[in-house]
């Protein structure tokens, strides 16, 4: 293979320190600096979280441009690359980026005269951008760069570049292990290592078109794929997963659903069949819905009918006989039916519920339940509760108590006497009951003022509360604005 000349760009980067005077970090974990140039990521050693951060790290980045003819082409291609610096603190779980700095690789490698501190010195200082965890001024990065563009032979240089790339992307070693690295390198130089030839072979193989190799699925994948339904397989057919046929290793028993025989027609009349019909229709819609094709559904299942269905029918017959014997009017029977509908759907299997053996509400509370007025009132209240969106637990009816009637009459008499006191100017204010309402700014609203102005206490009280809340809101807004101005 003939050797072709190419241009190689090398960057020697020396990172000195990161300074940020007067800034103290809240976290005490170590910090390191991550650098990305030519798409190659490298990082410095970790240092304590105390400014200034002294790194004194030296790194070399190299990249070959086989299509470049002159250095101008290399510089033009560097405009599309970005040099990135990230100051990262080892805060669990994945670390926290404190500040960053990014610049065009061309301007980073070949800075202008105003970006260099001295005429013969290549030291540079750039201001990084704060992200989080830093309070105060932005940190400043001090480093120096040396850039060289040279010619190389692409056939022999590829092996060397691959070797250097593997070495540079290795984890950063600690200083005490440098001696071991030097001895190992000297031994590798003395002996003819086959690694370089291996890199050359890999580079030649990389030029050839690559082909994907198929692997047999793992047992877990095989087991999971066997559990997919036929609908899911049809959905995955356009992915061309291959002609592999997934077969079950062991035949599993079918999915079992325990089912109870349907109740007798009399029980359906008691509980109401429309609810079950709606539930059955919803279940059929769920099975026939094409939006659930990706969900797992068993292909076959059995229905096991238990002998407890007979007990269920017997309990329903007992319940029906009990309700028919206890019912005294048609509205009461409808109320009982609604009560049964609100109970849980699961019924006892072996014996009827002990609730059926309890005494009725009439026997427990000793009230006249069978009167037509009470039954109509109960029926109307149940209708209102069912129509409302927010049904609260409340009493079905209120018993008429003579003591309550007396209290209402007493309150009416007091109100009438209060109005009579207001109309009588000779009646002393110390002898009559006070009905004044405290307003804002030391004002009071009395019954006499209400009778003169034709306004009751309620709207006056609401206006007073509106003024009070409006003043509180203004005070809160002014206090917030004062605090913001102080900050």
Swiss-Prot record:
Lineage: Eukaryota, Metazoa, Chordata, Craniata, Vertebrata
One GO BP: cell differentiation
Protein name: Spermatogenesis-associated protein 6
Glycosylation sites (chain numbering): 181
Disulfide bonds: none
Superkingdom of this protein's organism: Eukaryota
The keyword Phosphoprotein belongs to this UniProt entry's keyword annotation: yes
Residues covered by region (Disordered): 170-221
Keywords assigned by UniProt, alphabetized: Cell projection, Cilium, Developmental protein, Differentiation, Flagellum, Glycoprotein, Isopeptide bond, Phosphoprotein, Secreted, Signal, Spermatogenesis, Ubl conjugation
Gene name tied to this protein: SPATA6
Cross-link (Glycyl lysine isopeptide (Lys-Gly) (interchain with G-Cter in SUMO2)): 247
Listed Polar residues bias regions: 205-219
Organism of provenance: Bos taurus (Bovine)
Family: Belongs to the SPATA6 family.
GO molecular-function term, one example from the UniProt record: myosin light chain binding
One Pfam family in the UniProt entry: SPATA6
Subunit structure: Interacts with MYL6.
Signal peptide: 1-17
One term under GO cellular component: sperm head-tail coupling apparatus
Protein's job: Required for formation of the sperm connecting piece during spermiogenesis. Sperm connecting piece is essential for linking the developing flagellum to the head during late spermiogenesis. May be involved in myosin-based microfilament transport through interaction with myosin subunits.
Modified residues (Phosphoserine): 216, 218, 264, 273, 324, 342, 345, 353, 423, 464, 486
Protein localization: Secreted; Cell projection, Cilium, Flagellum
